[in-house]
């Protein structure tokens, strides 16, 4: 299935039904009084996050989503039926923005999360509501309210734990296909990867994490060159970035250090928060480098690149070094989750301390 990560739709809620101005008509009841019912509520348009959907392609072709109007009220105090709601199923990770105001309406981060995109109009009152001691035969009624109408922009940010960075042909697709269940297209020409790929890496029966591979970046990507800039937003939710570098390019004139610096510069131009994420250096294609030259080439790269963070040496093709990298990622993600859990627990601890400082009469000490 084609991966679509952006779409524009129009959500149109139903109008509320009009209230009825009706009077009770019955034999031997000459002054039956008002009995006009209210109009029904207009249908609303909802979005629901569904983990079984991974693309916005359906919304490229179905752009207008209209809920039904509420029915008008009738006599005999009959209320109009409410209009049917429309529910749109979207991938987990979808951002929904109002195109007219720029307001972020929803960020669908959990399966089953439901949000109202356009609210249906309220039904109007029938004349039964206007009866009083001074107005025994009211003829006024209220029309239903119009439903909301919104132009919406949908953006999908994939929910991955680890994101892969690198130039085209750095070996990202080969790496993700070796360590996970993903099977991206792999070939010896640039931009083989044209859309993001997700792979689930199973460390054991109980532990796994998700890796996102995006099209390779080139210099000028932040200004729109190449393909990768379109998909950099998919890395914003990750907890770790792996910067994969081709240490043995086919073209001997290509400098791996210059290419690595170019990637980091593009990352910084695009988003400072993305640049500040934890980032590991992964030196790939060591199987192509003669064994006696490996240590020298790696040492020279790190020195010229001025890198002080974690470094991993792998061959995505043969799998050398991949196992050690996978377990290091697992430990890093576990530490991140532990930090998040501790941060969430802190307010509860402060609350407990405050409760212990209250005397028997309910006054704080």
UniProtKB/Swiss-Prot annotation:
<feature type="binding site">
    <location>
        <begin position="191"/>
        <end position="195"/>
    </location>
    <ligand>
        <name>GTP</name>
    </ligand>
</feature>
<feature type="domain" description="Obg">
    <location>
        <begin position="1"/>
        <end position="159"/>
    </location>
</feature>
<dbReference type="InterPro" id="IPR027417">
    <property type="entry name" value="P-loop_NTPase"/>
</dbReference>
<dbReference type="GO" id="GO:0000287">
    <property type="term" value="F:magnesium ion binding"/>
</dbReference>
<comment type="function">
    <text>An essential GTPase which binds GTP, GDP and possibly (p)ppGpp with moderate affinity, with high nucleotide exchange rates and a fairly low GTP hydrolysis rate. Plays a role in control of the cell cycle, stress response, ribosome biogenesis and in those bacteria that undergo differentiation, in morphogenesis control.</text>
</comment>
<dbReference type="GO" id="GO:0042254">
    <property type="term" value="P:ribosome biogenesis"/>
</dbReference>
<dbReference type="InterPro" id="IPR014100">
    <property type="entry name" value="GTP-bd_Obg/CgtA"/>
</dbReference>
<comment type="subunit">
    <text>Monomer.</text>
</comment>
<feature type="binding site">
    <location>
        <position position="193"/>
    </location>
    <ligand>
        <name>Mg(2+)</name>
    </ligand>
</feature>
<dbReference type="InterPro" id="IPR006074">
    <property type="entry name" value="GTP1-OBG_CS"/>
</dbReference>
<dbReference type="InterPro" id="IPR045086">
    <property type="entry name" value="OBG_GTPase"/>
</dbReference>
<dbReference type="Pfam" id="PF01018">
    <property type="entry name" value="GTP1_OBG"/>
</dbReference>
<dbReference type="GO" id="GO:0005525">
    <property type="term" value="F:GTP binding"/>
</dbReference>
<feature type="domain" description="OBG-type G">
    <location>
        <begin position="160"/>
        <end position="334"/>
    </location>
</feature>
<keyword id="KW-0547">Nucleotide-binding</keyword>
<dbReference type="GO" id="GO:0003924">
    <property type="term" value="F:GTPase activity"/>
</dbReference>
<dbReference type="InterPro" id="IPR036726">
    <property type="entry name" value="GTP1_OBG_dom_sf"/>
</dbReference>
<comment type="similarity">
    <text>Belongs to the TRAFAC class OBG-HflX-like GTPase superfamily. OBG GTPase family.</text>
</comment>
<keyword id="KW-0479">Metal-binding</keyword>
<dbReference type="InterPro" id="IPR031167">
    <property type="entry name" value="G_OBG"/>
</dbReference>
<keyword id="KW-0963">Cytoplasm</keyword>
<feature type="binding site">
    <location>
        <begin position="166"/>
        <end position="173"/>
    </location>
    <ligand>
        <name>GTP</name>
    </ligand>
</feature>
<feature type="binding site">
    <location>
        <begin position="284"/>
        <end position="287"/>
    </location>
    <ligand>
        <name>GTP</name>
    </ligand>
</feature>
<dbReference type="InterPro" id="IPR006169">
    <property type="entry name" value="GTP1_OBG_dom"/>
</dbReference>
<dbReference type="GO" id="GO:0005737">
    <property type="term" value="C:cytoplasm"/>
</dbReference>
<feature type="binding site">
    <location>
        <begin position="315"/>
        <end position="317"/>
    </location>
    <ligand>
        <name>GTP</name>
    </ligand>
</feature>
<feature type="binding site">
    <location>
        <position position="173"/>
    </location>
    <ligand>
        <name>Mg(2+)</name>
    </ligand>
</feature>
<keyword id="KW-0378">Hydrolase</keyword>
<keyword id="KW-0460">Magnesium</keyword>
<keyword id="KW-0342">GTP-binding</keyword>
<dbReference type="InterPro" id="IPR006073">
    <property type="entry name" value="GTP-bd"/>
</dbReference>
<dbReference type="InterPro" id="IPR005225">
    <property type="entry name" value="Small_GTP-bd"/>
</dbReference>
<protein>
    <recommendedName>
        <fullName>GTPase Obg</fullName>
        <ecNumber>3.6.5.-</ecNumber>
    </recommendedName>
</protein>
<feature type="binding site">
    <location>
        <begin position="213"/>
        <end position="216"/>
    </location>
    <ligand>
        <name>GTP</name>
    </ligand>
</feature>
<dbReference type="Pfam" id="PF01926">
    <property type="entry name" value="MMR_HSR1"/>
</dbReference>
């Amino acid at each position: 299935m084609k991966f679509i990560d952006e779409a524009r739709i129009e959500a149109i809620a139903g109008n509320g039904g009009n209230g009825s101005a009706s009077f009770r008509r019955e034999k031997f009841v000459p002054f039956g009084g008002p009995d006009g019912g209210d109009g029904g509520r207009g249908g609303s348009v909802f979005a629901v996050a569904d983990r079984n959907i991974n693309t916005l392609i359906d919304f490229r072709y179905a752009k207008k989503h209209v809920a039904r109007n509420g029915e008008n009220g009738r006599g005999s105090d009959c209320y109009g039926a409410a209009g049917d709601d429309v529910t749109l199923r979207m991938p987990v990770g979808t951002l929904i923005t109002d195109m007219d105001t720029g307001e972020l309406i929803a960020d669908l981060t959990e399966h089953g999360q439901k949000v109202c995109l356009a609210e249906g109009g309220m039904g109007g009152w029938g004349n039964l509501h206007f009866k009083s001691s001074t107005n025994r035969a009211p003829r006024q009624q209220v029309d239903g309210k119009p439903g909301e109408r919104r132009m919406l922009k949908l953006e999908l940010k994939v929910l991955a734990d680890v994101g892969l960075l690198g130039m085209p042909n750095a070996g990202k697709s080969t790496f993700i296909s070796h360590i996970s269940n993903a099977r991206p297209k792999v070939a010896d020409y640039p931009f083989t990867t044209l859309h993001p790929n997700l792979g689930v890496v199973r460390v054991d029966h109980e532990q796994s994490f998700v890796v996102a591979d995006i099209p390779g970046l080139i210099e000028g990507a932040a200004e729109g060159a190449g393909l990768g800039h379109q998909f950099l937003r998919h890395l914003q939710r990750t907890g770790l970035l792996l910067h994969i570098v081709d240490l043995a390019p086919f073209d001997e004139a290509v400098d791996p250090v210059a290419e690595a610096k170019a990637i980091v510069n593009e990352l910084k131009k695009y988003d400072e928060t993305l640049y500040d994420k934890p980032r590991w250096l992964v030196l790939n294609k060591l199987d192509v480098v003669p064994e006696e030259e490996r240590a020298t080439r790696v040492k020279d790269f790190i020195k010229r690149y001025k890198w002080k963070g974690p470094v991993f040496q792998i061959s995505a093709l043969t799998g050398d070094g991949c196992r050690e990298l996978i377990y290091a990622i697992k430990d890093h993600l576990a530490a991140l989750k532990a930090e998040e859990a501790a941060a969430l627990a802190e307010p509860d601890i402060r609350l407990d301390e405050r409760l212990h400082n209250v005397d028997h009469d309910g006054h704080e000490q």
